Curated annotation (Swiss-Prot):
Protein name as catalogued: Ribosomal protein L11 methyltransferase
Gene Ontology terms: cellular component: cytoplasm
InterPro entries, A to Z: Ribosomal_L11_MeTrfase_PrmA (IPR050078), Ribosomal_PrmA_MeTrfase (IPR004498), SAM-dependent_MTases_sf (IPR029063)
Gene3D superfamilies listed in its UniProt record: Vaccinia Virus protein VP39 (3.40.50.150)
Record family assignment: Belongs to the methyltransferase superfamily. PrmA family.
NCBIfam families linked: PRK00517.2-1 (NF001784)
UniProt cross-references to SUPFAM superfamilies, sorted A to Z: S-adenosyl-L-methionine-dependent methyltransferases (SSF53335)
Keyword annotations from UniProtKB, A to Z: Cytoplasm, Methyltransferase, S-adenosyl-L-methionine, Transferase
Chain's gene name: prmA
Subcellular location: Cytoplasm
Pfam families named among the record's database cross-references: PrmA
Main location (coarse class): cytoplasm
CDD domains membership: AdoMet_MTases
Organism whose genome encodes this protein: Agrobacterium fabrum (strain C58 / ATCC 33970)
Length: 292
């Protein structure tokens, strides 16, 4: 049964906004959505939804209805997805990414790792987060800064994806880490990446939608919570997230466009967190907040 991709071509900022909109709209439906950079110099991006071919007519109409009010004039295009090994394909030409002392790399670039590096080997393929996106790189930089400056006894990586951020915490500090994701495939991939990086203890991985799991009560409250998701769900979950944060605890938030920064800050200031620092990477921001 063939798979297709419906996509629109736009700018990086609009692609992020479209991704945010589609994530909120499609929720837990059995479709995948993504943004892809096509041409960095000309700021050309694609926002895509992946589905089975027989769903095309229904989803074309739904996507058109969803996007038309805010993004008039966008043309929905189609690509038939060939039957290839996407994990291998995703790693072709993938260059190592440096963020502070961290270097995120594939197996083909192990020789690029230097003795002082905190190396994270990721074969993401099926899950978001190889370090190449500004949100992931910003989180890695912030994690290093926070763990250098503060005493952290345990951590939560909410929406772990490939597991790269949870692995980063364990690479810097031998503390217990809980990593969760709504997607069981992401959790499976994260477990493989954890094993690949030689982490044999101190890491719990769970499939959990939001905070609806006993794992949060079992492992929390947390001195550090990392959530690299999207602005809308981050805003909605602010009151819940703060209840799982230990007194004096730290939060790192990303997946946020620069234009959404104040809305997210407002939600977390309202939940009694203080803003400490913002890292800017292109049009994306990573926020550091603290519970007083």
């Amino acid at each position: 049964m063939s798979e297709i991709r419906l996509y629109v071509t736009t700018t990086e900022i609009k692609a992020g906004e479209i991704l945010d909109l589609m994530s909120d709209y499609f929720g837990e439906e059995d479709v995948a959505i993504a943004t892809t950079e096509v041409d960095e110099k000309r700021d050309i991006w694609e926002a895509s939804v992946y589905l089975m071919a027989e769903q095309e007519e229904e989803f074309r109409e739904r996507v058109s209805t969803l996007l038309a009010p805010a993004f008039p004039g966008l043309v929905i295009e189609k690509e038939i997805i060939p039957d290839v090994d996407w994990i291998a394909k995703s790693l072709e030409g993938l260059k190592p990414v440096r963020a502070g002392r961290f270097i995120v790399h594939g197996a083909h670039d192990r020789d690029k790792v230097q003795p002082h590096d905190l190396a994270i080997e990721i074969e993401a393929g099926q899950a978001f987060g190889t370090g190449h996106h500004g949100t992931t790189a910003g989180c890695l930089e912030m994690i290093e800064d926070v763990l250098r400056a503060r005493k952290v006894r345990n951590a939560l990586d909410l929406g772990t994806g490939s597991g790269v951020l949870a692995i980063a915490v364990r690479k810097m500090r031998p503390i217990p880490v809980l990593a969760t994701d709504i997607d069981p495939i992401a959790v499976k991939v994260a477990k493989e990446n954890v094993r690949l990086n030689g982490i044999v203890s101190g890491m719990a991985l769970e499939t959990a939608p939001g905070f609806h799991s006993d794992a949060f009560r079992k492992h929390g409250p947390f001195d550090l919570i990392i959530a690299n998701i999207l602005a809308r769900p981050l805003i909605k979950m602010a009151p819940q997230l703060v209840t799982h944060l230990a007194p004096g605890g730290t939060v790192i938030l990303s997946g946020i466009l620069a234009s959404q920064r104040w809305k997210v800050l407002s939600a977390y200031n309202g939940a009694k967190l203080s803003h400490i620092r913002t890292i800017w990477r292109n049009d994306w921001v990573t926020l550091h907040l603290r519970k007083d």
